[in-house]
Each structure stands twice: as C-alpha cells, then as structure tokens.
Amino acid sequence: SVLDAVRVNFNVVKTEDDEPNQFDLEVYNLSKSTRTKFETTDNRVILQAGYASMGLKLLAIGDIVRGSTEFKQPDVITSVDCRDGGRALRDARASLSFEPNVPAKTMVEELVKKLNVDNIEIGFDLSGTFKNGWSFYGSARDGLNKLGSCFGFQWSVQNNTLQLTKKRTPSAREAVLLTPSTGMIGSPSRIDKTGNNLTKAKEEPGLKVKCLLNPALVPGDPVVIESADYPRGTYRIVKVAHI
C-alpha cells in the first residue's frame, strides 16, 4: 500500500556497522486494514521524505519488528518499529565450501545470495584468496564478518542494499557537500578522541554536524564539511539520524 497525505512522525538511525539500521514511525488515523499491515511482523516498510523543492527521496527501508495501535481521541496512532534487512540478517543461514584460491569477491557474493537483499555494492577492489580453501556453516551474517576480518572490509545494509567498504575507508561514491549554504545548521562539534567507540575502532577524532533533512547522507560514504570554524575537509559518515 502507498500512503500519502497522512501525518507521520519518524526517527531513523543508520550506522556503518553490521547491526541493522532501525527506524520508528508514528502514523496517524489509518484505516483498520492498513493498521493491520503495520502491525504484522516482517512486512516491509519503505519510507520516503523530502522538501517540496526536491520532492520525495528514499529515506529508509525496513522489515517490521513490532507494531501496535493506540487510541488517543481524536487520533488513532499506529507505532511501528522497523529494521533495515532485519529479517535477512536474523534468518539467513549458509552452508558453503570453496576450493583453494577462489577469489574473495566470489565467496562474498555467494554469501550475500543467502541474505535476499536487493543489491550488493562493493566500493573497492576486493581481492585475496584462501590457499587451502574455505568452508563455512552458520548465519550468513557471521560468515561475512569472518571474511571481513580476513580481507579487511566492513559491511552494512543500507536501504536493503549490502554495502562493502574497506575498513575505516569511505566508499567510492561522490561526496555530499555540507556547508551553511547547503543545509548545515549551526557549527560542527568535535567528537572527543577518548570516546569509547573511537578508541575501540582506532579512529581519529571526527565531527558531529546538524543539517536539514538530506537522504543522500549514507553511512560509509564520504562527506565534505566546511564552515567558518572548520576548513574544508573530507570525512567518512559513521552515523546518520533523521528525526
């Protein structure tokens, strides 16, 4: 079903790690049949949003984890909790065996077939082999993590597309430019180097930026940031929150 001209509140959080991205919706005054669809686990939700000047853009895709409806007169509010690739990452299992010297890319592609995502994007030259071959049985998610540890990549599911990048390296996509004239709100704030996440990942300090809604901002992609307080620089997006 396509919903238009309804009141919707959303909170979308995306990261570049292997945990499913999540988003929550509050949808107002739906018909009973439509409410039932939003209350059905594993149904797929596609969220589009945007300003009148740019039209609707894809913001998030997810499988319903839970849905419920609350009657608050005069409104009927349906709350929905979704996960991007949630069903695939939860359920997909693999039993695979590869001969010696099979390319890493081939092994990854075979694992991804078990996930039933829409696409796979490999943003770098994925190379390497196992000279003695490789066998795996278990969740497809665990298999990708094992290959990532061996061949130096990280992966995430973004809008039901599996995205691979070199560890701590942005994808090859064109960078989004964030400046006060392109939607930046206020000034960037520096992320403390001693933060637990940065220390664990051996990351350099980064920036936290607030801006107008921009669906083009995707974890793992490059972004160019420039403001009065910070000279132009290219950064890797590690987390995006659309609220």
Functional labels for PLM-detected ranges:
Residues 61-70, 168-170, 236-243:
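Short, compositionally biased
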Residues 30-116:
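Surface-exposed cap/loop segments at beta↔alpha junctions
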Residues 60, 160, 233:
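Residues that flank catalytic or metal-binding motifs in active/ligand-binding sites
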